[in-house]
Amino acid sequence: MYAIIRLRGEVNTKPAIRDTLSMLRLHRVNHCVFVREDEHYRGMIQVVKDYVAWGKADADLLTMILEKRGRLSGNRRLTDEVVREISPYKSIRELAEAVCAGAASLKDFGIKPVFRLHPPRKGHRGIKKTVKEGGELGYHESIAELIKKMR
């Protein structure tokens, strides 16, 4: 499973990139989505690589985001009690493990697929450079560090 965070805005963006960001449901800066690992999403990430940070996510990271930023329709918070009501899982942790394994999806239970994050504490290292150049754009070996800064 990949975690993708939009870091750059829409000004002077090519239409193909804007459309791809829209298909990924990344309409605003600092929004995050989790997508499964397949060639379709990999191609979409390749198109928008200069506008997003992305990396492999695990169940621990998804659990943290669901607890902190998980929302249902009506902007209700996601808690263990709510998870017990809307799904066969007993906790957010079990739900996150099932989603990472591919046994369930957030959409099945009415959980909003987009997570609205804060700007990172202590700031970005730069949104015009890739990770290799000392910035934030592109593939992160540990995307969890960036997401924890943006929690």
From Swiss-Prot:
Belongs to the universal ribosomal protein uL30 family. Part of the 50S ribosomal subunit. It comes from the Archaea. Pfam families: Ribosomal_L30. Keywords: Ribonucleoprotein, Ribosomal protein. NCBIfam families: PRK06049.1, uL30_arch. Transmembrane segments: none annotated. HAMAP family: Ribosomal_uL30_A (MF_01371_A). GO terms for biological process: maturation of LSU-rRNA from tricistronic rRNA transcript (SSU-rRNA, 5.8S rRNA, LSU-rRNA); translation. GO terms for molecular function: RNA binding; structural constituent of ribosome. Disulfide bonds: none annotated. This is Large ribosomal subunit protein uL30. GO terms for cellular component: cytosolic large ribosomal subunit.
